[in-house]
Design a protein with these regions (language model features):
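Alpha/beta enzyme core
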Residues: 1-95, 106-122, 146-151
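A generic structural signal for short coil/turn motifs at secondary-structure boundaries
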Residues: 23-25, 131-134
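Histidine/acidic-residue-rich catalytic or RNA/ligand-binding cores of hydrolases
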Residues: 106-111, 133-142
């Protein structure tokens, strides 16, 4: 499908959400799993990749050993985002991160700062916008834009 889309000048956008098999809820957002999902989307030809922000969980025992051996820092969201960006052809793909469950404003702004600092290309902010009154949502979005612009 990606070759067909590219042949007619369309960008390929892929939601790369790992699910199924033996993967549990914690595994869906584990750093090793999210980074691999982003990498696979890039290999499949995606120009734009959407993944969930990764947690500091390492789901696969083999990955945990490899991360420890390579001394990969996974302690903060920005470090984990940077790792996902590296897995996406070292930043040569656009990677946006889902907003997830509704959060309080400070929690959301803290997450957006971590995404920005890790090199994310953006956020998909759905329910965090639409589940708020219009004026509050617009103010929130203005602040998020300011964060990505480095003004906040």
């Amino acid at each position: 499908m990606s070759l067909e889309a590219k042949s007619v000048g369309l960008a390929v956008v892929m939601w790369s959400y790992p699910r199924g098999g033996k993967l549990d809820k914690a595994g869906e957002t584990a750093l090793d799993v999210c980074a691999y999902a982003a990498h696979m989307a890039a290999l499949l030809g995606a120009h734009i990749i959407k993944v969930k922000p990764p947690t500091d969980v390492l789901w696969q025992p083999e990955a945990k050993a490899a991360y420890e051996k390579a001394s990969i820092d996974i302690s903060t969201l920005d470090k984990r985002i940077a790792h996902v960006m590296q897995a996406s052809f070292n930043g040569r793909r656009i990677v946006v991160f889902s907003g997830g469950e509704a959060k309080d404003l400070e929690g959301l702004f803290t997450e957006v700062r971590g995404l920005r600092d890790g090199g994310a290309n953006g956020s998909i902010i759905g329910r965090n916008t639409f589940q708020r009154p219009r004026e509050q949502a617009l103010d929130m979005l203005d602040k998020i834009v300011g964060i990505y612009q480095g003004k906040m």
